[in-house]
Regions:
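Cleavable N-terminal signal peptides of Sec/SRP-targeted secreted and luminal proteins
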Residues: 2-19
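Mature soluble extracellular domains of secreted precursor proteins
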Residues: 19-175
């Protein structure tokens, strides 16, 4: 459920941050701990098991897009939709966008930088999936968008570190 629950919207983020990598790690940890009570019943309701779950790597390598994984992908999307509905963040096929942002504000009220990043990611991802009319597909597409955005956060921090290391090497060579 780990990365699957990540979808449940970057909404239940309870942490502070200073770097992109730290934001990513804290997001994942907070989401896992805060959504577990919703996830298990939703897996059960959708006849899904731990074997149906996709890892972050599975998503980043597009494993879900292979034809033989269509049913697994559908189940994942339906579990995500169920979790969102239990949190009153989705009704029918519509994501309650205003409620998502209210939830982010409630959970991250004392963490401006992380709150701003969560709002940015959610605005982008909700806009991207807005026209999808099937709830399981919409929910899974939202999940994919969030995972990709989180991966970019981590990559951004790695590039900053690479850049700092290169700057140090240039400085050392100049001396």
């Amino acid at each position: 459920m780990k990365s699957l629950v990540l979808c449940a919207c970057v909404l239940v983020l309870a942490f502070q941050s200073s770097s992109s990598s730290e934001i990513k790690d804290r997001l994942k940890s907070a989401v896992r701990s805060n959504l577990q009570k919703y996830a298990e019943p939703c897996f059960s309701e959708n006849n899904a098991t731990g074997d149906d779950r996709y890892t972050e790597e599975d998503i980043m390598t597009n494993l879900y897009a292979k034809p033989e994984n269509a049913e697994r992908t559908r189940k994942n999307g339906c579990v995500i939709a169920c979790v969102m509905k239990k949190q009153d963040l989705m009704e029918g096929t519509n994501i309650k966008e205003a409620q998502v942002h209210v939830r982010i504000n409630e959970v991250l009220m004392n963490d401006g930088p992380v709150q701003a990043e969560a709002h940015r990611i959610m605005r982008k991802c909700m806009k991207k999936v807005r026209s999808i009319t099937q709830e399981c597909e919409k929910s899974f597409s939202l999940h994919v968008c969030i995972v990709e955005a989180m991966d970019k956060l981590g990559q951004h921090n790695e590039h900053e570190l690479d850049s700092d290391t290169e700057d140090e090497a240039v400085t050392e060579q100049a001396e």
